């Protein structure tokens, strides 16, 4: 189980280090999505720090807000963004691993990620690492 308190603390610390603030936390409570979001504003940007509910993996993406229950299932993959200053600040928080947009937009190698359910891989057929780690699969 991922400690949500540590995630919240990391988001606040990273936002402060960038001269910004946390707008809100969007915590997943149902089957989907398989990630939580900490939405941060800094400068003229809004981004989401996303935390996989199954692993201690963090990434930075465009914030995602489904507007209806149907959209959750049709929302597609996250759009990961380059934010080197945030990635560097996130990497300082022990207990989490941080992946960059380049990592997540790269091809998915199932052999390198044995903790991801093989049935899900076979059914959903993720093309990128980001699709495999951060998704709306049920």
Features from the language model and the residues they span:
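Acidic, proline/glycine-rich low-complexity IDRs
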Residues: 97-138
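Intrinsically disordered, low-complexity regulatory segments
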Residues: 1-111
